[in-house]
Every structure is written in structure tokens, then in C-alpha cells.
A protein has these predicted regions:
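Short coil/linker segments at helix-helix boundaries
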Residues: 139-169, 179, 185-196, 201, ...
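Extended ligand-binding clefts on enzyme/binding-domain cores
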Residues: 229-429, 443
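Conserved, well-structured interaction surfaces
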Residues: 41, 72-181, 417-424
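Membrane-proximal, proline-rich intrinsically disordered regions
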Residues: 3, 20-71, 85, 237, ...
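Bacterial N-terminal signal peptides that target proteins for export
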Residues: 1-8
């Protein structure tokens, strides 16, 4: 009898534990989704965030190596990039944010979207994959592509032509999917898409602009079909005819300065709402425009014409006590003065003389250079592109104050495109016009180009 009671008690205990486990496992934790439970519409927003950040981080790094911006002498990785002395790992951040933040989610998103016949999400997958891998081959040349994003921990590398042609093909496939009609019961693209806010026509126009952009890179590959890796001027014009036709078709991400409580999860721990160029540039010290950028904006090709964007791209500093004998190319507006450009190429390049140095500010002496070298005195006219923020940095405005938040005499404006809430222009009507003008000019149609 005692033995029988023990058996019965054991069975009851097993049943109790099983029922408890079943009772506790009634929901999927929304804060910790698995690969199986994550919704494809939720993945898209995550993918878009990390893809855009990878693109913008790459853009800032390449702008240094292309000669538009530099940093103060000895200013670390970015200074070295601007003088073509790159250190190992200079481009690892775009790689990491693309693969670890965005691309690792692509296949699962596509699989779930395909099961739901969510054509627009599948189209977004194709276009984003083409956009991201084209960036990778632009930066690295060879890269895992056909074998990437799978279970192979050591994927095979593809050459640049394979990646390029694959991206072009995926772009065409994505455009076809975006043009399909989804069932009304299928999750709308707007639920996960903050790039185009669910506007499939905007995606189609942006995708065609990307196609024109990609084919235009082949200018030195000889005439022929773009599907064979040749320069195809007619395909560019055909794509542009389906691309942005006005500024209303621009693909723009509008950032905010609300100090979002949602932060990225790749270790930077920064708010997801502000501009990625603010993260990598605007909030950081020491970046200065080069003479090449300055000349292109203020005297392009020696024609004496100033670009109307010059005052917004070149940074300004407030100077209540201007010195006598300021260089002639320093522009003033009241007590504000616009930055000069750092000479990076001639024999008088500051780099050969220990410059450029960062300007300092004191409430008694204003702007000054901490150096006994008289050749460095005019380095105060190289204004840094640093700005601030009201939300994230709790600053009174977007101006950076070198000597502290309350010292208005030390204000710096920053540059428009790297401020905290500056928009990200992923594709614009202006770019479409420039590409069209270039193609027509090279075809000999100068009147059409102009």
C-alpha cells in the first residue's frame, strides 16, 4: 500500500510540473523575440536603421580620404585617413553595422515575407541587399556575397564584378516586387518602413535612381549592356525616366533631437532618432574643411562663382574680438566668420609645419592657438565642424560652445549636414538631374546637359 501511494504521488508531481510549465509558457516574450517569432515588418525598421548608419559612416570616412575634410594634426584615425595614411580597421565600422546590424536579419525577413506573400517587404529586401552589398564592394572590392549570410562561418569571397552584377540583378527583382499588388490582409509596408513611409512609388523611384547611380560607375568599362558590366548610357536614361521627377520624390530620412530612450544595440548605446552623421562627425571635435572643398564651394573651377550652399556647409565661429590682418578669404557676417580651407596639397601645406592646430578660447583673449610657432597663429581661421544638441546634450541650441554651455563668445555653428536633426538624403531629384546632365554631356548633347 505504501509503495502504491508513492507511485501515485510521483505521478501527481510529474503532472503538476508539466502543467506548470505549460501554464507559464502561454506567451512569446515581445521584448526578446527569437528568429522564429520576430515579425518581418518589425525586422525591416531594424534593417533600415543599421543599413543607413553603415552607409553614412562609410560616407564620412570616404569624404576624409577623398579630400573634402581633414582633422587637426595628429588627430588620430581620421587625420591619417585625410593624409592617405590609413590605419588597420579604418572601414570596419560600416562592415560591422551592415553585417551585424542589418544583413543578418535579411534572409529571415525575406522567408517570413514570402510565406505571407508580402511582395513589398520582399521588394524592400532585394533593394536593401543590393544597396548594402554595393557599398561593401565599393569599400572593399572583394567580399563574401553569394555565400554570405548563411550558415558557413567562412564564406567564399566573390570578386567585384560578381557582386556588382548580382546587385544590379537583385535591384531589378526588387523593383518588380515593389510593383506587385499585395492582398489587403497582408501587413502594409508602412508598418515597418520609415524610409519611404510605405510609399511603394517612392521606393520604385529611389530604386531606379540607385540603378542609374550604379550603372554610371561603369563609365570607364566601355560601352555595352549594363547586365554584362558595361557602361550603358541608355539604361541610365531609362532608369532616370522612372526615377525622381521632383523634390517630392526624394527619399529622405528626417531625424529628430528628442534624446530617444531607444538606443542602438551594437555597443555605441546612442539614441536611434538622431542623424548618424552627428554621431560620427557633428558631435566630435577637430574636423575642418579642406582647401579643395572650400575652393569647390566658393570658386568652382576658377569661375569666381560661389555655391549658394557654401555658407551652410562651411562652419562658422563667433568672434567678438577680430584680429587685424585676417586672411583675405575669410568671410564675415557681423561677428561671425566663416572657415577657411586647410591646404592639403601644396608646399605650404600646414601638415609640413606641424599644423593645422586646434583653436582654443578664453573669455579674456578670445580665440588663440596654443603654440609658440608664429606660422600657426592663423590656424584660428580653420573653424571646426562641431555642433551640439538640445535633446541629447541638453544644450540651449544646436551651436557648440567651445568654452562651455554658458560662454556664447565661443560659439561654433557646425555644418548643416552633420547636425543632430539634419536629414539624410538617400536619393534626391537633384542627384538624378546631375547624373542625367553628365550622361548627356558625355554623349555630346551639351544643350540638353545644361
Amino acid at each position: 500500500m505504501k509503495y502504491l501511494k508513492s507511485i501515485i504521488m510521483s505521478l501527481l508531481l510529474v503532472m503538476l510540473l508539466a502543467s506548470c510549465n505549460e501554464w507559464l509558457n502561454v506567451n512569446t516574450d515581445p521584448d526578446n523575440p527569437s528568429s522564429e517569432s520576430a515579425l518581418f515588418q518589425n525586422r525591416l525598421a531594424h534593417i533600415e536603421f543599421y543599413t543607413n548608419h553603415a552607409q553614412q559612416f562609410a560616407a564620412w570616412r570616404t569624404s576624409m580620404s577623398m579630400g573634402d575634410w581633414t582633422r587637426y594634426n595628429g588627430g588620430g584615425t581620421y587625420f591619417n585617413m585625410s593624409i592617405w595614411y590609413p590605419v588597420g580597421g579604418i572601414c570596419t565600422t560600416p562592415y560591422q553595422w551592415w553585417f551585424v546590424g542589418a544583413a543578418c536579419n535579411l534572409n529571415d525577413m525575406y522567408k517570413r515575407a514570402e510565406e505571407a506573400e508580402a511582395w513589398h517587404y520582399m521588394g524592400a529586401f532585394k533593394i536593401i541587399r543590393a544597396y548594402g552589398f554595393m557599398m561593401m564592394t565599393d569599400l572593399y572590392g572583394e567580399m563574401p556575397y553569394t555565400d554570405a549570410l548563411g550558415e558557413n562561418a567562412t564564406p567564399e569571397y566573390d570578386d567585384g564584378k560578381t557582386i556588382y552584377l548580382g546587385c544590379i540583378e537583385e535591384l531589378d527583382e526588387g523593383l518588380a516586387l515593389m510593383a506587385k499588388t499585395q492582398a489587403p490582409t497582408t501587413p502594409a509596408l508602412a508598418l515597418g518602413d520609415y524610409w519611404g513611409n510605405g510609399d511603394t512609388q517612392k521606393w520604385i523611384k529611389w530604386g531606379n535612381l540607385l540603378k542609374a547611380r550604379f550603372i554610371n560607375k561603369l563609365i570607364k568599362k566601355g560601352a555595352g549592356s549594363y547586365k554584362e558590366g558595361k557602361f550603358d548610357s541608355q539604361a541610365i536614361l531609362d532608369a532616370l525616366a522612372k526615377g525622381p521627377q521632383s523634390i517630392n520624390d526624394n527619399m529622405v530620412i528626417y531625424h529628430t533631437d528628442n534624446n530617444s530612450t531607444t538606443h542602438d544595440v551594437l555597443g555605441w548605446n546612442e539614441p536611434v532618432d538622431y542623424s548618424p552623421l552627428y554621431s560620427v562627425s557633428g558631435m566630435n571635435a577637430g574636423y575642418m574643411p579642406t582647401k579643395m572643398l572650400f575652393d569647390n564651394l566658393t570658386n568652382f573651377a576658377g569661375y569666381g562663382v560661389e555655391d549658394p550652399r557654401a555658407d551652410r556647409i562651411l562652419p562658422w565661429a563667433y568672434d567678438a574680438n577680430p584680429r587685424a590682418g585676417a586672411p583675405a578669404d575669410v568671410k564675415w557676417s557681423g561677428n561671425w566668420r566663416r572657415s577657411r580651407g586647410v591646404d592639403m596639397t601644396s608646399g605650404d601645406c600646414p601638415i609640413f609645419q606641424g599644423g593645422p592646430l586646434r583653436a582654443n578660447f578664453s573669455t579674456t583673449n578670445g580665440w588663440f592657438i596654443q603654440s609658440d610657432n608664429p606660422a600657426r597663429a592663423n590656424d584660428i581661421y580653420y573653424v571646426e565642424a562641431t555642433s551640439s544638441s538640445k535633446g541629447y546634450a541638453a544644450n540651449p541650441d544646436l551651436l557648440y560652445r567651445r568654452a562651455g554651455k554658458t560662454v556664447d563668445g565661443s560659439r561654433e555653428s557646425g555644418t548643416f549636414y552633420t547636425r543632430v536633426s539634419s536629414p539624410t538624403y538617400m536619393g534626391s531629384y537633384a542627384e538624378a538631374c546631375f547624373i542625367k546632365a553628365e550622361v548627356l554631356f558625355n554623349k555630346g548633347d551639351k544643350s540638353g546637359a545644361f
